Amino acid sequence: MEIKRYEGTGRMSRAVVHNNTVYLCGQTHAEGDVKEQTEEVLKKVEDLLNKYGSDKNHILSANIYLRDMKDFADMNSVWDAWIEDGNEPARACVEARMARESLLVEITIVAAVK
């Protein structure tokens, strides 16, 4: 099967489509508190999924990285308002060192093509 890579930087692709599955690289936003960053990241996720043939209701799995687990409840309040009942993906959330000090959350997504 063909592998399609989109928006490559020489280091990574923002999206890869293979076997009717969309893989998104980690999405971040470096401004605001964890709620604001989560909102912006989820907007990016939704835009990329729509651009490459999927949407948030077709998300299969999500990996969420938080700089500090104290932000878990705040991040979840945004996530829970965004994801629709009945379309909850498999999900993991872990505390992680981030690439930049200003990053509080990073989300990677795997979704089915519509």
Labelled PLM ranges:
Residues 1-60, 66-114:
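N-terminal presequence-like segments and the immediate start of the first folded domain
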